[in-house]
């Protein structure tokens, strides 16, 4: 994959960057994705891994590619977009359905980004940057003040996931 000047949602490098990201994803998959784990346990493990190995990039998204999965997984520093992209990459690696979601203009923070993940047959909100784990859409809207365009996204449960 060649990087193009001004391209969105890409990592500013070529094979080296992609191979580093793939190595992180593969390490995460091989170390933490045990045979027979439930969707819940796989998502929880990926979530805990990201929360334990990445800090919020207060300097801004432009440092250490903090708005990319690479910034979160390789540099260990990200903003919400980097956390959400890293969570998507980890879920892809461990075989869990995951969507990347961006707040709309009516949200308390219109630039915020997070994920929707499927655990069993239920879709829930997951925000590794802020600490939201398997929340229902009602909780996410009420407590975090988030709203988003749901077109093209699976319908989330209204209530939080209970194991």
Regions found by a protein language model. Give the residues of each.
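Secondary-structure boundary elements
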Residues: 13-72
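Hydrophobic/aromatic-rich core segments of domains that either
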Residues: 82-147
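Active-site nucleophilic cysteine motif
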Residues: 42-46, 76-91
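A glycine-rich, coil/turn loop motif that links secondary-structure elements
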Residues: 63, 72-76, 105-108
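Long, amphipathic alpha-helical segments that form or neighbor coiled-coils/leucine zippers used
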Residues: 6-10
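Short, low-complexity, Pro/Ser/Thr/Gly-rich segments in the mature regions of secreted, periplasmic
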Residues: 148-162
């Amino acid at each position: 994959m060649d990087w193009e000047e001004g391209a969105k949602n890409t990592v500013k490098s070529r094979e080296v960057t992609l191979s580093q990201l793939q190595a992180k994803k593969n390490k995460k998959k091989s170390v933490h994705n045990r045979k027979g784990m439930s969707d819940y346990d796989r998502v929880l493990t990926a979530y805990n891994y990201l929360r334990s190995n990445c800090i919020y990039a207060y300097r801004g998204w432009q440092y250490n590619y903090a708005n990319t999965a690479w910034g979160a997984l390789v540099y260990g520093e990200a903003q919400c977009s980097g956390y959400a992209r890293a969570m998507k990459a980890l879920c892809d690696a461990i075989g869990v359905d995951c969507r990347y979601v961006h707040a709309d203009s009516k949200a308390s923070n219109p630039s915020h980004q997070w994920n929707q993940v499927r655990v069993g047959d239920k879709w829930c909100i997951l925000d590794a940057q802020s600490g939201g784990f398997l929340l229902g859409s009602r909780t996410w809207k009420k407590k975090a003040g988030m709203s988003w365009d749901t077109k093209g996204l699976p319908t989330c449960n209204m209530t939080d996931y209970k194991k």
